[in-house]
Amino acid sequence: MSEQPTEPLSIKEEYQLWRKNCRYMYEFVSETALMWPSLTIQWLPNYTTTNGLIDAKLLLGTHTSNQSANQLKVASTQLSADPNVKANSKIKTVQKLENNAEICRARYMPQDANIVATINGLGEVDLYNLDTETRYSHFAPHTKNGYGLSWNPKQKGLLVTGADDNFVCVTDTTTNKTTFKSDIQKDIVNDVKWHQFNGNLFASVSEDSHVYLFDARDNKVVSQYYAESSNGINSLAFSPFAENLVAIGNTSSNINLLDLRKLGENSGLLHTMMGHSEGITCMEFSPHHDGILATGSQDRRIIIWDLFKVGEEQQQEDAEDGCPELFMMHAGHTAGVSDLSWCPFKDWMIGSVADDNIVHLWEISKKLITNEEAEVDVSILE
């Protein structure tokens, strides 16, 4: 008799299978349920270590669907700094700061982590001082919902934003004056980021399937790329190690790697990575390891990619598990992933949030990393 096709697992069954295998993939995993879903997450860089425990904080937001006041939240958690000391890594809210609408993104200023910017569902930007627990500035560079929000890592106070009104704006937050506004995009702007090395360059991606690279000195487009088969571009990330590398995440579920030096309307594509089954929602390069990229998707998955594995030969059985650059898949969320953040002070730790109201904090198993980083003993090839 021929084998009957197996029924796909339900979301609940997938989750149970993931929980069963957690001990093989992670040093630890923490799950905390929120009252309201958070569309944003970011580790704060400041932490303290006492008696083998790290006291850390994260930025979160709320999306209450107008059933309650929306808030920027600061959450605290404990992580283990000593393998012999067990931490309770459930998070708890320690600060709540009100906002006029759901918070789509919240990001701290690189030069002063006590200053946090948010962009909300109305396209408004708010600036908060965590030390004084105040919202000290409010302006509206956009007229519609916005997800694009990025602080300039080189020039203090410069903030670039992008929103559903098709605009990209640069604001000097010391004066709240808009220094640049672009309407070259023909559709919703989904993400904006400053370049990691050059404080004058930033990029946007949008539903019109274009990447635009801007120069803030001239207020003009330096170059552009059209991702024809993307069905719209949702996210981008500049590499913190390779100044000419940018990654974009598409509605089509694919990730494109681009070379800024060769960027043109139909050129600059280095490689396309396939592993997700639905649109990409967020992405971030590891700040610790060159070539390591994390991507989140509507398919409820986060994939860790190792770009140095691109093009490696595979055995047939390995190829069935995915392309060589697919290092690891985090499959614990039960709804689309909204945002993710690499921990700035623990190499292989990520925080992630999804539409299921759950915050995940997870550290990749040292055994997986050791296998990934193991070098071939050349003596066995002689």
Swiss-Prot record:
Keyword Electron transport carried by entry: no
Record's keyword annotation contains ATP-binding: no
Annotated TM spans: none
Segments of this protein annotated with the region Interaction with the histone H4 N-terminus: 317-321
WD repeats: 98-138, 141-181, 184-224, 228-268, 275-315, 332-372
Pfam families assigned: CAF1C_H4-bd (PF12265), WD40 (PF00400)
Subunit field text: Component of the HAT-B complex composed of at least HAT1 and HAT2. The HAT-B complex binds to histone H4 tail.
Species the sequence originates in: Candida albicans (strain SC5314 / ATCC MYA-2876)
Site (Important for interaction with HAT1): L245
A GO cellular component annotation in the UniProt record: Rpd3L-Expanded complex
Protein name: Histone acetyltransferase type B subunit 2
Entry's localization field: Cytoplasm; Nucleus
Main subcellular localisation: cytoplasm
InterPro entries, A to Z: Histone-bd_RBBP4-like_N, WD40/YVTN_repeat-like_dom_sf, WD40_repeat_CS, WD40_repeat_dom_sf, WD40_rpt, WD_repeat_RBAP46/RBAP48/MSI1
